[in-house]
Every structure is written in C-alpha cells, then in structure tokens.
Amino acid sequence: MKALAFPILLLVLVACTEANVGKPQSVGEPYDVTLVATDKRLLKTVSGMMGVTMAGLPQEERLFTVKTAKGKEVNAATMYERTIVVVRRQDGNTRIRYERNPYARDQLLVFIDTPSAEALRADSAKTAKALQRLIDQFETRVAMNHDRQNHNLKLMRTVEKTIGCNITIPSDIRASKTGKDFVWISDNGTRTMRNICVYAVNGIRTSQEEIVSLRDSVMAANIKGEREGMVMRTERRADVMFSRHGKAIVARGLWHMEGDAMGGPFVSVTLPDSARNRTLTAEAFVYAPSTTKARTMKRLEAVLYSLDIE
C-alpha cells in the first residue's frame, strides 16, 4: 500500500487537558508505555516504534519500556497507567490525538487511528517520530513541573548570584562548588552521580566547534581529578550531536577524565545572551559505570530547559 504523504504536523495532534482535582497519581515510571489494541499486528507495529535507542550514550539503551494489553479501549486494568497508547482501526488517514490527565495526574492518553495494519506500517516512520516526540515532551513537562514544586532555593540563588541567570535545581541535588562564572552542583551519588554545571563566558559563541572547545576549556579549569593533569574532556572519538530547542543549542556527547578511567554521557543547553554579550551554558553529566543512564540523562535534561536569562 502506498504511504500517505503527510507531514508530522498534520497528524492531527489534538490535546485535551482534564482538571486534576481529586484524581490519583498515575502508575509507572517516566517513559513507561502501555499499548492497547485488539489487533496483534497493530500492537507489534507500534511496539516497534518504541524500540529506539537513545543517542549520546556509551552503550545502546532503549528509552521506552513497553507493555501491551489486548482491548478496544482503556479499562479498569489500564486506566491509571502513566502513558497509554490506544491503537484503533478507523476510516481515513493515520492520525494521532491525545489527552492529558484523563484519569490520573501526570498521565498521557494517546489515540492512534489508522484504517489498517498495512496503512500503519506504511506510515510508521512519521507516526513513530511524532509519537516519540509527544511522549518525550510530556515527560519533560512533568519533570519541570515537579522541579518547580520541589526545588533547592539555596542553590538556585547561588547560580543567580554567581552567573546572573535562573535555573530550577531539584531539591535532591544539594552539593555545590563555585568558580569564576561557574557553578558545579552534584548529588554526590555512589552508584549514579548526577551533576549540573552552569557557566558563562564573554562573547557570543554558538557554533558547534566553539561550543565543544568552550566546554573543554571551562571543564578543564573547574573539574579536576585526584592527580595533576586529570581534567575533564569531551570524548572526540564519539560524535557530538547538536539540535535546536527554541533559541537554545542542545549538544549531546560523551566525556572522559584524562589520565583516569572515568567517563560517561553529557547533554548541554547553550543560550546566547546578546544584551550582555556573553554565552550561557547549562550542562548535565552523569557518572554511572555499572547501571543504565538513559532515563537519568532525560531527567537532568529537563532541568536544563529551565535555564533562563535574567
């Protein structure tokens, strides 16, 4: 069957948000997805859409955890799940509709309507991209809302005083170290160590090479190992990936400590501050050698999107 020629924006992404008063909290972890359909072929196709691996990690890791339930609609067994995707046969083009918080708080309900299993397979690339982006935006929004309600005001004021910008710091990240136009915040975790750095440099430096070079110089000056010469560097043997998020430039890649075995993933958000002729960057990096990192990085990435120029 010929693929339908529609751009992602024409997937009919219709949102409906219900009031949260009196509703229970949804069940499940971020990026948990429950698929509901009567047709096994539809379940298999959409499940395949969720099988992507997350970019910018040392090893391949899937971001989404998927379970399936057979049925036409949401029922008592599935209605409180965090993200529910109902796949239905309907006449017309393949399209997506979604609702926020229909049965519970912090919940996303997605309907994928398609005329047939063959049509859904033909449209799978564009449908998958739209579905993944929709769930990712939902999880980012939930995380940012949580941080606004559970933040570390003391460290937020430290960043504001040192850098002259605003960023929402989660309440469970408490340790900090300051330098010149630089703040390093960490939870000092033993199994997984989560870190956020915020820094500013003079001049507007937003090209890809400038962002990487700037990162190396700032991190080498402020994050050092136990012995002389141990400094943090960007891993140049792996690609650094760049994307846009509004006015911000997002970079993803790997870091390592020169002269040591430490390393892991990082993600950064860079903003030009034209009024002060400077460049602001907020970065998250993780050291977790024996555990998965995808969801931890996504959770920290949501923190970075709260970066705001005063």
Which ranges hold each PLM region?
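Positively charged n-region of N-terminal signal peptides that target proteins for export
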Residues: M1-P7
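Long, acidic/polar, low-complexity amphipathic helices and coiled-coil-like
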Residues: D32-L35, R100-E160
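Secretory pathway targeting signatures of secreted, lumenal, and periplasmic proteins
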Residues: A19-V21, T34-K40, P170-E226, M230, ...
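Start-of-domain marker
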Residues: A19-Q107
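Surface-exposed amphipathic alpha-helical segments
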Residues: R121-N145, I167, I173, T279-E310
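Signature of long, low-cysteine stretches enriched in small and polar/charged residues
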Residues: A69-E118, I223-N277, T291-T292, Y305
